[in-house]
A protein has these predicted regions:
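C-terminal interaction appendages of subunits in large macromolecular complexes
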Residues: 7, 11-310
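Short, small-residue-biased leader/transition segments that mark boundaries at the very start
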Residues: 1-6
């Protein structure tokens, strides 16, 4: 679950945890159909996915949260009433609502029994182990197990309410978002990441291609290049001389003078031409991505698929 304070506004975001695969599926559905409505999104993302389990009571709290950005989601422990060997009944608890502390809950129930604020319980034991949670609540012979359980739901954290607030910072301002708005912000953010990343890759490829074009000239005139370097009093002079003689710029000339003479003479023109050709293909690809928003959104859809199989 995401819980974050936006201090200056005195507001806190409290978003229940969700299944990653379902969330990505809903975001992809929104990319495919920007006009999708709430019911359509909820086909992919039916509700929160609490790691501790529990049972979400009804759909109205989820729907309100997704429709308005605020809602109360009631979660109950997963319980079962079973008949014990002695003819009495036990309430078995195997899952708790999200963020409920088991030890504190058991202690609280014991205090309620001791203070006679709840009737019908003779014993409570924790049999939880690595296999999972297992709390046993013994019901007195004369008591109704279902009434005892209802009282426990009303009086303890066997039933809790998760007050969801889907608050996010949008353009520097805290804003409560409904599900579609939240997913739209996510998609827009991912698109911005793809744009920036592609711009970075494009610049890197262009810079490398530019240096290689300079090296190609050096190979074509290798003897003269080596002679200029050898006859210049230092690197800075060699650089200026190369720039004047071959029309290179500072970056290209720097790349040449930084190489050892042995490296320069061993450079193969075909290797450099192959690398330039590969870079030109990449540059074309990056420019195509940057020019096409639809393409950027398709990349968003392709990339998260790997996360859903974790």
């Amino acid at each position: 679950g995401s819980e974050m304070c936006i201090r200056d506004r005195g507001m806190a975001t409290k978003i229940p945890p969700h299944n990653l695969g379902e969330t990505i599926d809903a975001a992809c559905a929104l990319i495919d159909n920007p006009d999708i409505d709430l019911a359509g999104l909820m086909d992919y993302m039916p509700g929160p996915d609490f790691p501790t389990g529990g049972i979400i009571m009804g759909r109205s709290g989820i729907r309100a949260t997704y429709a308005t950005g605020r809602g109360k989601i009631t979660v109950r422990a997963k319980t079962e009433i079973v008949e014990a060997k002695n003819g009495r009944y036990k309430i078995i608890v195997t899952e708790l609502p999200y963020q409920v502390n088991k030890a504190r809950l058991i202690e609280y129930i014991a205090d309620l029994v001791k203070d006679k604020r709840i009737d019908g319980i003779s014993n409570i034991e924790d049999h939880s182990d690595r296999q999972g949670m297992h709390i046993e609540i013994d019901v007195k012979r004369e008591a109704s197990a279902s009434i005892v359980l209802n009282n426990l739901f009303n009086l303890t954290q066997l039933q809790t309410t998760f007050g969801a607030i889907m608050l996010a910072i949008v353009d520097g301002v805290p804003k409560i978002l409904n599900l579609k708005e939240m997913l739209t912000e996510y998609v827009n953010f991912q698109q911005e990441i793809i744009r920036r990343r592609t711009e970075f890759d494009l610049k890197k490829a262009k810079d490398r291609e530019h240096i290689l074009e300079g090296l190609k000239i050096a190979i074509d005139f290798i003897d003269e290049v080596i002679s200029i370097i050898r006859n210049s009093k230092d690197q800075a002079t060699a650089k200026v001389n190369l720039m004047e003689r071959f029309g290179l710029d500072d970056v290209q000339a720097q790349a040449i003078v930084q190489m050892r003479l042995g490296q320069l003479t061993n450079m193969e023109r075909t290797k450099i031409e192959d690398e330039i050709a590969a870079l030109k293909t990449k540059i074309e690809e990056y420019n195509a991505i940057l020019a096409d928003e639809g393409r950027q959104r398709e990349i968003i859809k392709e990339e998260p698929v790997s996360y859903t199989h974790l």
